[in-house]
Amino acid sequence: KLVIAISVKADGKTYTTTEGRCLKRLGRNSKPAYPDELSNVYSSVQNPDFSGRIIGESTLDDINKLEVYSLKEKLRVRDSKSTLPDLDDIDFLRDLQLIKYDGDVERLTIAGLLFVGKETSIQRLLPQAEVIYLHYSADNLEEYDARLDLKLPLISVIDKLTERVQAYSKIENIQVGLFRLEVEDFPERVFQEALLNALSHRDYQSNAAVYVKQYPDRVVIENPGGFLEGITEDNIITHPSIPRNK
């Protein structure tokens, strides 16, 4: 049986169908590319995606297979129609651009190391990818009474800190008419969204860590990185989105 393989190099341009639709390839599926995604593509010409850079010292041995499995399972839950989790691990990582060819050798990208890298590999190749959790009690709001330092893949960081924050989170029962509602101090999804945002948009070229500070009445998340070029306090609301990491 004759098999013909055709390889087409990317030319950096964006193309549409005859109906004017712009599609992106994910696994075996073609999905629509939305306006915010297209603006990210265009902005990457002036602002290259740091998270997409290849780590020259990395190899496929730096991949933690358990983290790959965890990433697949979370994707399966989020998008049950996605075929990406059905791919073998290497094809899965290629499609997500977590690994790329560096000449003839496949290596991890910054994003790849952050999502599926081994703990020792993160400490060796990207030691600034650190999250420090500090807990403050009502008796002393100036000095923390518990600390946790993490240099782990992003999913593990989110899972561990969610568990830690929830351990100190209380539930208040509120009566609304005939219904009794449970209101958490720190809802899990809200905390995870805030933490993921901080981890995704931090400046990984800075040596500073992300700090998660939990007080009795609030959680404060601090991440390194100032405004990108062209963005100021005055135009941050109206300025087109320019992501630091995609």
Regions found by a protein language model. Give the residues of each.
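Divalent-cation
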Residues: K1-L23, S30, K118
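Active-site helix-to-loop segments that bind/position phosphate- or nucleotide-bearing substrates
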Residues: K13, G27-P243
